[in-house]
């Protein structure tokens, strides 16, 4: 039986509720492995994983590397600065070169939306999207979902408020797709200048007030203000942004008493979140990091083990 019929993980779009549940269940098993004294398995022994990062990353690249090594894979890291990359042709040339090395999986992070899908069309191995421009970041959404499910026991019928720089966030897009697929109620809270056009068509409720948007929320997911992606005046000032859209202890009171506080990292303390909240009892930010390794272990094992289990879809969805 083919439990996960996809060859690649390019995005959440294209995954069914069953696909997502399968990956989360598999990740739950990986958590147990990560908490053992002996963490290394031989599941992917003899297989090769190449991490190809065109954007600088610390936590995501380290998480993918650790995931592969805990499964026994041979892991190779390639960091390529965007200054030396001519998008498109160079990506294809790089793909051809790496494909000739016969890896089993390529993990790619790139500043251009669609880069992972393009790579998947050019190579014979599996491709995992570690973030492509403002498009998607599927493993982040999966690790967020795992964190929520382990804390709340479910994903359906919970209220999740995604707050901050939604416009520039691939994390927000992937989380919206996943949470909607799993039956959650999703809100976005942000100034109009930080919301993409047509956001309401994604099946979310839109709020411009933190107090209103957080009312009765089960989860408060803060997003980093991505000033490096801003070419114009999206916010009057950082100070004013924090005043209206930063999460501090007082603002958090609008949510449920047991609401989870999440952040994909890296955090801008004092910009979108106060230290008292980030380090407070409702924060599960550290748990998100732990779940990231487990989710990426689950994805690697699922894609590589499923290669010999029958036909799989080739679409960009997954």
UniProtKB/Swiss-Prot annotation:
Any single GO CC term annotated in Swiss-Prot or TrEMBL for this entry: cytosol
Catalytic activity line of the entry: carbamoyl phosphate + L-aspartate = N-carbamoyl-L-aspartate + phosphate + H(+)
One Pfam match: OTCace
Organism (species): Rhizobium rhizogenes (strain K84 / ATCC BAA-868) (Agrobacterium radiobacter)
E.C. code: 2.1.3.2
Name of the protein in question: Aspartate carbamoyltransferase catalytic subunit
HAMAP family hit by this protein: Asp_carb_tr (MF_00001)
Homology family: Belongs to the aspartate/ornithine carbamoyltransferase superfamily. ATCase family.
Enzyme class: transferase
Binding sites annotated in the UniProt record for carbamoyl phosphate: 59-60, 109, 137, 140, 265-266
Biological process, per Gene Ontology: 'de novo' pyrimidine nucleobase biosynthetic process; 'de novo' UMP biosynthetic process; amino acid metabolic process
Described purpose of this protein according to its UniProt entry: Catalyzes the condensation of carbamoyl phosphate and aspartate to form carbamoyl aspartate and inorganic phosphate, the committed step in the de novo pyrimidine nucleotide biosynthesis pathway.
Oligomer status and interactors: Heterododecamer (2C3:3R2) of six catalytic PyrB chains organized as two trimers (C3), and six regulatory PyrI chains organized as three dimers (R2).
């Amino acid at each position: 039986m083919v439990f996960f019929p996809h060859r690649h993980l390019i995005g959440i779009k294209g995954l069914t509720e069953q696909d997502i549940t399968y990956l989360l269940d598999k990740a739950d098993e990986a958590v147990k492995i990560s908490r053992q004294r002996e963490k290394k398995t031989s599941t992917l022994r003899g297989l090769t994983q190449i991490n190809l990062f065109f954007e600088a990353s610390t936590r995501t690249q380290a998480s993918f590397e650790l995931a592969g090594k805990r499964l026994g894979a041979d892991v190779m890291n390639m960091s390529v600065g965007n200054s030396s990359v001519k998008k498109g042709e160079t990506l294809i040339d790089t793909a051809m070169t790496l494909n000739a090395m016969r890896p089993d999986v390529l993990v790619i992070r790139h500043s251009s939306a669609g880069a992972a899908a393009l790579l998947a069309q050019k190579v014979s191995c599996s491709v995992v999207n570690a973030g492509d421009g403002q498009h998607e970041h599927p493993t982040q959404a999966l690790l967020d979902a795992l964190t929520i499910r382990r804390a709340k026991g479910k994903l359906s019928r919970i209220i999740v408020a995604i707050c901050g720089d939604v416009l520039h966030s691939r994390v927000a897009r992937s989380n919206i797709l996943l949470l909607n697929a799993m039956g959650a109620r999703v809100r976005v809270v942000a100034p109009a200048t930080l919301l993409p056009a047509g956001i309401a068509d994604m099946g979310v409720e839109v709020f411009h007030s933190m107090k209103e948007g957080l009312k009765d929320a089960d989860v408060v997911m803060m997003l980093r203000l991505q000033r490096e992606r801003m070419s114009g005046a999206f916010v009057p000032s950082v100070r004013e942004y924090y005043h209206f859209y930063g999460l501090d202890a007082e603002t958090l009171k609008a949510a449920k008493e047991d609401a989870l506080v999440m952040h994909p990292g890296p955090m801008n303390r004092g910009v979108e979140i106060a230290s008292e909240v980030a380090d407070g009892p409702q924060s599960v930010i550290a748990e998100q990091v732990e779940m990231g390794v487990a989710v990426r272990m689950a994805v690697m094992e699922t894609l590589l083990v499923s290669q010999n289990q029958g036909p799989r879809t080739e679409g960009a969805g997954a």
